[in-house]
UniProtKB/Swiss-Prot annotation:
InterPro entries recorded: CinA, CinA-like_C, CinA_C, CinA_KH, Competence-induced_CinA, MoaB/Mog-like_dom_sf, MoaB/Mog_dom
Native organism: Enterococcus faecalis (strain ATCC 700802 / V583)
Record-stated family: Belongs to the CinA family.
Name of this chain's protein: Putative competence-damage inducible protein
SUPFAM superfamilies: CinA-like, Molybdenum cofactor biosynthesis proteins
CDD domains named in the record: cinA
Gene transcribed to yield this protein: cinA
Amino acid sequence: MKAEIIAVGTELLLGQVVNTNATFLSEELAALGIDVYYQTVVGDNGGRLETLLTEAEQRSDLIVLCGGLGPTEDDLTKQVVAQHLHKSLVEDQEGLNRLHQFFQQSKRPMTENNLRQVLAIEGGQVLQNPTGLAVGSFVTEGTTSYLLLPGPPNELIPMFQQAARPLLIDAFPQEEQLISRVLRFYGIGESQLVTEIQSLIAHQTNPTIAPYAKPNEVTLRLTVKTKDLVAGEELLTATEEKVLAKVGDYFYGYGDDNSLAKVTVDLLLQNGQTVTAAESLTAGLFQSTLGEIAGASKIFKGGFVTYSQETKENFLGISHELLEEHGTVSEACAKEMAEKARQLAKSNYGLSFTGVAGDPLEGQPTGTVWIGLAEEGQPTVAECFHFNRDRNYIRQSAVMRGLDLLRRRIINKK
């Protein structure tokens, strides 16, 4: 089963938008046992798209097109595919109802060109859009099938997961399937992680082990090809156990959509605990990161951004003498910030971030960061870290390290 992905959009060719859809679709199709042999990007040009379709149908059983389903004249994917297949475009009634409902609720006039979004290819199956207005299409002509999806990832991904995947499973049943498990690691670089599990990688067959470096973390994707899903999961578990026996100290969670922040928030939710923070160099980034996670309001009452020495004294009540003696970038300051914040917010935990993201300060080089951790009924501690690269990387690295310190403190109590 050979598939091809065609991304439509001049903005992709100009580099104005990164084609993340191809990555998502390739992984999803592979999981269904469908091999992707070609990926192509074409601009909003009907002639070039027509030429590409003619080439693609000579070499692929499934052609997946993403983008060009919107309301404007340059959104021409459906029109070109329909013309190529000598088929008409018809209005989808369900999509039309949702379109009218959207504009009625938003109290905006609906222009005529919006009707283009609810056109589907005659004789095909319509894919409803749970997060947008443009419907998709799935149509088979001869030995070639065409799947049309919207371009925005926040529309393409739900449409694929909810509508396209079941259609593809029915249309292209496979004897074997690929199932994957993603392991996430923090505090170890890709090169070190690969070195630690080199013997496993060198002898991998089924499952396979694929490392991926991400900002401030590393993931491993374990993938098995199997006819039996239960047996496949058992193989993944056996491989996971071998991996974690070597690098388990750095493991924090599973899944593509997971994060260190989400895992930490979930732990606090499970324990019914709260956290606050006093931030200097991170300027609220830690608190903002918590706020991105669902359920954060239950574990985070509020916090403090104390960038200057004056605000550390006035907002947190840290003594002028302590700051003059030890400096703001110090263990003593970090401890006081964490404990004062915890007391003021009446939280179970208090974190603090103080350091140097810009030019050297108080004799401390750029990248020096002290992170304090206060816990009700426990001695307050602070650790010093040294991060490289630019200002934002230093700040983001500090937040990640703070999350990991808190996560480890919580799980070590279990």
